[in-house]
Every structure is written in structure tokens, then in C-alpha cells.
Amino acid sequence: MKVVMLGADRSVKGGVSAVVNNLYEAGLDQRIDLTYIGTMVDGSTAAKLLKGVQALLKFVTVLPKADIVHLNMAADASCYRKLIFMQIALWFHKKVVIHEHGGDFQGFYYKRCSAKRQAYIKKMLNLSLIHI
């Protein structure tokens, strides 16, 4: 099985990176054909934009051979970034697993998203194979 996993770059200090690094330390990449793509780095806006573009280019390159796309998603900008990747994965008819991180997703969804954005996020989450 070929899995493409996306999330914050493994060098970022944060929860998503810690989980991903733990998966690598546990040998997940030895058990499945895993490609990890970091979609965000710490640093300037320019560095973040460059990382996002690089991630997008790599994603469309490896996506055709993938069986599953695993998105590590948190609130705010992380959610919007991952939904872009999810939409592309769905265009390629790929199965998508969403792993939601962080305790503030409900606050983001209910307090910081308009009704229109909530509807879009809900629609996308419902299109995933599984949402954990």
C-alpha cells in the first residue's frame, strides 16, 4: 500500500511533527510505502510560501501512484492548507484519511469560521474515508 502523508515539516516544533516523528521512530515507514510531505515550516512568510509551493509540486508528482492520502490537520491555516491538498486528492479519486490534531478545532470551526466556511469544511470532512 502506498500512502502519502502530509503535515507540518518534521523539523517544526509542534504536535503534528511530534506525532509524525514518533511514527517514523516506531518504523511505520518500514511497514508501508510511505512518502511524507511537509507543507509548512517555521519562519518568514516567504519561507512558508516557498514550502507550500514545493509541497504542492511534490504532492502532484507522487499522488498518481498513491493508494491513500493521510492529512495531518490542525485548526486555522493548517485546515485550509490541507483542504486544498484534499481537493486535489479527490480529483485524482484517492481515498483520504484526515487526522485532526489540536484541542482548538471546535473553537476554530464554531467561533472563527463563517457559516459558509463551516459548510465547506463539513462537506470536505464528510468526503474523507475516515476522520480521526
Kindly label every feature range from the protein language model.
Residues 66, 128:
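An anion/phosphate-binding loop that grips the pyrophosphate of nucleotide cofactors and donors
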Residues 35-64, 71-82:
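A short, charged, and often flexible helix/loop element on the N-terminal side
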Residues 28, 90, 125:
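Anion (oxyanion) recognition and catalysis
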Residues 68-70, 86-105:
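Active-site proximal beta-strand in glycosyltransferases
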Residues 82-87, 113-118:
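Charged helix-capping and loop-helix junction motifs
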Residues 1-41:
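N-terminal subdomain of nucleotide-sugar transferases
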Residues 130-132:
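Conserved small/polar residues in nucleotide/adenosyl-binding loops
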Residues 74-78, 96-114:
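A short, histidine- and acid-enriched strand-loop-helix "catalytic/donor-clamping" loop
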